[in-house]
């Protein structure tokens, strides 16, 4: 499935966001404290089933529609 991005076909593959969880966990260690930062990075206007970059027009993407 090298020509698909999640559940959608993208004309420009470089605009596709890697399929997987939209949550990123970064663990930052310092001398005095340990901090865990969890960021929610939702893809635009979908329910997480399809992730495409903002410049990617996925014509047959079913992003929860």
From Swiss-Prot:
This protein's name: Metallothionein-like protein type 3
Keyword line: Metal-binding, Metal-thiolate cluster
Native source organism of the sequence: Carica papaya (Papaya)
Cited function: Metallothioneins have a high content of cysteine residues that bind various heavy metals.
The keyword Metal-binding appears for this protein: yes
InterPro entries, A to Z: MT3
Membership in a protein family: Belongs to the metallothionein superfamily. Type 15 family.
An example Gene Ontology molecular-function term: zinc ion binding
GO BP annotations listed: cellular detoxification; intracellular copper ion homeostasis
